[in-house]
Amino acid sequence: MFDFDATLPLMAVQFLILTVILNALLYKPLGQALDNRDEYIRTNLQQAKERLQQATELAQQYEQELASTRRQAQALIEEARVEAQKIATAEIAEAQQAVQAELLKIQAEIDQQKQATLQALEGQVASLSEQLLAKLMA
């Protein structure tokens, strides 16, 4: 059934030589290529994580700067609104004073014209009374 002659040790030696040759020519370079590929993937993954972290930090920084800028813009808008309100209030007060002064001036002119008209009418009443009396007597 099984012969133990010189072929068995020769096959064992051939197997060992083939194993050494395959190990030297195929398995080690293939293992090294797989190790290099694994290292390349790990390196790229680590770099991607670092870039993602940097991008996240930059995004947070930009968000904070944007929020700060928005707050500053809102403060400037509020300040401008308050200033415009002050200016409008001052101009309204100035216009009211000008209108009040004009009203006083017009009232004074009306009073003066009223007095002049009353004096003229008093003078005419006296002369008309004399004319009426003269006509009635005549």
From Swiss-Prot:
Positions bearing N-formylmethionine: 1
Membrane spanning stretches: 6-26
Listed GO CC annotations: plasma membrane-derived thylakoid membrane; proton-transporting ATP synthase complex
Molecular-function GO terms, alphabetical: proton-transporting ATP synthase activity, rotational mechanism; proton-transporting ATPase activity, rotational mechanism
This protein's record includes keyword Oxidoreductase: no
Record-linked InterPro entries: ATP_synth_b (IPR034679), ATP_synth_b/b'su_bac/chlpt (IPR002146), ATP_synthase_B_chain (IPR050059)
Pfam families: ATP-synt_B (PF00430)
Keywords attached to this entry: ATP synthesis, CF(0), Formylation, Hydrogen ion transport, Ion transport, Membrane, Thylakoid, Transmembrane, Transmembrane helix, Transport
Subcellular compartments: Cellular thylakoid membrane
Membrane topology reported for the UniProt record: Single-pass membrane protein
Top-rank taxon, per record: Bacteria
PANTHER family: ATP SYNTHASE SUBUNIT B', CHLOROPLASTIC (PTHR33445:SF2)
Primary role: F(1)F(0) ATP synthase produces ATP from ADP in the presence of a proton or sodium gradient. F-type ATPases consist of two structural domains, F(1) containing the extramembraneous catalytic core and F(0) containing the membrane proton channel, linked together by a central stalk and a peripheral stalk. During catalysis, ATP synthesis in the catalytic domain of F(1) is coupled via a rotary mechanism of the central stalk subunits to proton translocation. Component of the F(0) channel, it forms part of the peripheral stalk, linking F(1) to F(0). The b'-subunit is a diverged and duplicated form of b found in plants and photosynthetic bacteria.
Family, per entry: Belongs to the ATPase B chain family.
Summary of subunit composition and partner proteins: F-type ATPases have 2 components, F(1) - the catalytic core - and F(0) - the membrane proton channel. F(1) has five subunits: alpha(3), beta(3), gamma(1), delta(1), epsilon(1). F(0) has four main subunits: a(1), b(1), b'(1) and c(10-14). The alpha and beta chains form an alternating ring which encloses part of the gamma chain. F(1) is attached to F(0) by a central stalk formed by the gamma and epsilon chains, while a peripheral stalk is formed by the delta, b and b' chains.
Name assigned to this protein: ATP synthase subunit b'
Organism the protein comes from: Thermosynechococcus vestitus (strain NIES-2133 / IAM M-273 / BP-1)
Taxonomic placement: Bacteria, Bacillati, Cyanobacteriota, Cyanophyceae, Acaryochloridales
